[in-house]
Amino acid sequence: NYMVLNSEYDYYNYINGTIPYVSHTAEGIFVNRTAVCDGYSSAFKLCMDILGIPCEIITGEGDGVAHAWNAVMLDGEWYMVDVTWDDPVPDNPGVVNYDYFNITDEKMRRDHSYTSDINANGTKYNYYAQQENYFTNTTDYYEYLNKKLSEALESGVENATVVIYVESLDEPIDREFIDAYTDYSKITANYHSIGSSSRYSSYVMMIVWRLS
């Protein structure tokens, strides 16, 4: 969070081909407050080294462009971390994304390509896995939404917002699922209006339900 909230990607110099050396280093993050991917990854590794947490810098490509990020070991399992891609561009003060925080090789390889001897298969410390509103199957998803709808009805509130994160499979399938639940909720929840908006990352669909 500190790195994302207190620095920004050196986009101006990147698009103009004028990236200074310091933006490739941890100094770019901690002193100049601006850097490119290898500056982010170097700064993250420095923090992990100080904390005594095993960490490596991984290089490869992100969406076909040369890129650098990190692998970190927690409780004997490796995870992939891409701080650069979790920092919004252009800079959005106060906003931190967690789509690339402690994810597996399988998820990282959806838009990153690389060769590494490290096998990142850890899931316990993935950001979303630590949240009660993250689901990998529709059964738990339904139960959670029904619970939140019931709580809202019982409390007597006129408007309610429920945010969930779902393991995304395929956008058309996900859309059908959202529409089906919307129709179901209109009948069972006694709300006059129920709608949703969604945002996709490489593997997570965030759905915001607004009820009134």
Show which residues each predicted segment covers.
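Acidic/polar residues at beta-strand termini and the immediately following turn/coil
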Residues: 6, 10-13, 82, 197-201
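Extracytoplasmic/periplasmic, Sec-exported soluble proteins
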Residues: 29-40
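Generic solvent-exposed, charged/amphipathic alpha-helical segments
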Residues: 1, 45, 178-179
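Low-complexity, Gly/Ser/Thr/Pro-rich intrinsically disordered linker/tail segments
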Residues: 92-208
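Secondary-structure boundary elements
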Residues: 1-29
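Hydrophobic/aromatic-rich core segments of domains that either
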Residues: 39-106
